[in-house]
Regions:
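Residue-level signature of catalytic and energy-coupling elements of molecular machines
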Residues: 50, 219, 235, 272, ...
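Catalytic-core segments of nucleotide cyclases and related cyclic-nucleotide turnover enzymes
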Residues: 278-300, 305, 332
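A generic structural signal for short hydrophobic patches within well-formed alpha-helices
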Residues: 196, 248, 277, 310-314
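Arg/Lys-rich, alpha-helical DNA-contact motif
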Residues: 1-38, 43-173
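Solvent-exposed polar/charged
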Residues: 224, 297-298, 316
C-alpha cells in the first residue's frame, strides 16, 4: 500500500514491532484521524494541529494510525483549550506546551536508545547492526522502568524550578518595566574545546566518541553538582547558566580545572557574563548570550573571559578573595566591535 515501508521486513520483525506497539500504545492502531477527532469531541483541524505539535508527520484523514491513548491525549488537550475549564490556556500556549514536550521526548528517546545500543555493542562485542537488532528484542524490559523514571524526574525538576522561581520573585524589589526589558537576570557562559575541528580530524571514531562523552559528562556533573544548570550542549561546547553570579564563577573555574587535568585532559576555554536574558523554548536569548559567545572566542586555552561589569561584580563580592580578575587587551568581536575582556582565575583551591 502507498505510504507503507515494509520492504525487507520479515514476519519476525513485524511481530517484534507489533509487540512494541502493543506495549507502548496499549493496542494496535485502529482509528483514523477523522475517527480520532470524533471520539475526542474535537474538529479534524484541532486533531491535525495536535498531531503536528506532537512532532509527527501529517497523516491522511482516512489512514488507520491511532489508538485509545491518542483519544485520551487529544481530549486532555481539548480541555486545556476549553474556556470554561479552570486550566484553560490560549491556543498558541497549548501548542507551545505540546511542542516543548514533543521536542524533548524526541531527543530523550533517541538518547536512551543510542545508549542502549552502545551498551550492547560494547558488552557483547557486536557491530552496530547486530546491537540494534538485539536492542529491538530487549528494549521492552526497560519500558516500564524508564516510564516511571520519566515521571519522577519531571516532578523533581518541576519542584526545583518552582522553588527557584519562588525564591527569585521573593527577592525582587521594585524593578524597571518596559516592553524591551529582558526579564531575567542570569549569569551564564560557554565552555568549548580548543581547536576541536583540527583535533577531531586526526582521531578515530572511538577516540572522538570517548573525548566528547568525557567532555559532556564532566560538564554536566560539575555544572549541576555546584548548583548551576546546563542550557545545551553543542558538540564541542556547553552552555551553562545560574541564578547567582558567584555560583556561576565557582562552576566555570571548577569546570575548566576539571577538564584540563588527568590522563584524558581536554584543553578548553570559557566565558562568564551576568546580565538580562529572555527564556524561550528551553533556551535563553539576548545581548548577554551574544557577548558570552564572543568572549569565549577571545579566551586563550585554559582561560576564562568576562566583561567589565561582571568582573567588577566579582571584585566587589563577598568572595572576591577567592578570585583573581584582570583586564586583557582590547579585541574586535564579531557583531559587537571593539571590546575589552577581563580574565578570571581562582586563587584558592577548587572545592571538591
Amino acid at each position: 500500500m502507498e505510504g507503507e515501508t515494509t520492504v525487507g521486513v520479515g514476519p519476525a520483525e513485524r511481530t517484534t514491532l507489533a509487540g512494541h506497539e502493543h506495549l507502548l500504545l496499549g493496542e494496535a492502531p485502529s482509528l483514523t484521524l477523522t475517527e480520532l477527532a470524533c471520539r475526542a469531541g474535537t474538529s479534524l483541524e484541532t486533531a491535525q494541529k495536535f498531531w503536528r505539535a506532537m512532532g509527527f508527520a501529517d497523516v491522511t484523514p482516512d489512514a488507520v494510525h491511532f489508538t485509545e491513548q491518542d483519544v485520551a491525549a487529544l481530549q486532555d488537550t481539548a480541555t486545556l483549550l476549553d474556556e470554561t475549564s479552570e486550566s484553560a490556556l490560549a491556543s498558541a500556549s497549548v501548542l507551545e506546551l505540546l511542542r516543548a514536550q514533543s521536542y524533548t521526548m524526541d531527543r530523550l528517546v533517541l538518547w536512551e536508545l543510542e545508549t542502549f545500543v552502545t551498551d550492547l555493542s560494547e558488552r557483547l562485542s557486536l557491530d552496530d547492526t547486530s546491537a540494534r537488532l538485539v536492542a529491538l528484542d530487549r528494549i521492552d524490559s526497560l519500558v516500564d522502568l524508564l516510564s516511571r523514571q520519566l515521571n519522577y524526574v519531571w516532578r523533581r525538576h518541576m519542584a526545583s524550578i518552582l522553588g527557584r522561581t519562588d525564591a527569585e520573585v521573593s527577592a525582587r524589589g521594585r524593578e524597571d518595566t518596559g516592553p524591551d526589558l529582558y526579564p531575567l537576570i542570569r549569569s551564564l557562559g560557554f565552555v568549548d574545546i580548543v581547536s576541536f575541528t583540527q583535533r577531531a580530524q586526526g582521531m578515530s571514531k572511538a577516540a572522538l566518541t570517548h573525548m566528547l562523552e568525557g567532555f559532556e559528562n564532566t560538564a554536566r556533573d560539575v555544572i549541576t553538582s555546584r548548583g548551576a544548570r546546563v542550557v545545551k550542549t553543542i558538540g564541542d561546547a556547553v552552555m551553562y547558566i545560574s541564578d547567582d553570579l558567584l555560583v556561576a564563577a565557582d562552576v566555570v573555574t571548577a569546570l575548566v580545572d576539571e577538564l584540563q587535568k588527568g590522563p584524558d585532559a581536554i584543553r578548553v576555554r570559557a566565558s562568564l557574563v551576568e546580565g538580562r536574558v529572555i527564556s524561550r523554548s528551553g533556551d535563553v536569548f539576548g545581548p548577554t548570550v551574544n557577548l558570552a559567545s564572543r568572549l569565549v572566542d577571545a579566551a586563550e586555552p585554559g582561560g576564562i573571559r568576562l566583561d567589565e561589569a561582571t568582573a567588577m561584580a566579582i571584585l566587589h563580592s563577598p568572595e572576591a578573595s577567592r578570585y583573581r580578575v584582570g583586564q586583557c587587551h582590547e579585541v574586535v568581536a564579531k557583531g559587537l566591535g571593539q571590546i575589552v575582556p577581563w580574565s578570571l582565575e581562582r586563587t584558592s583551591p577548587v572545592r571538591l
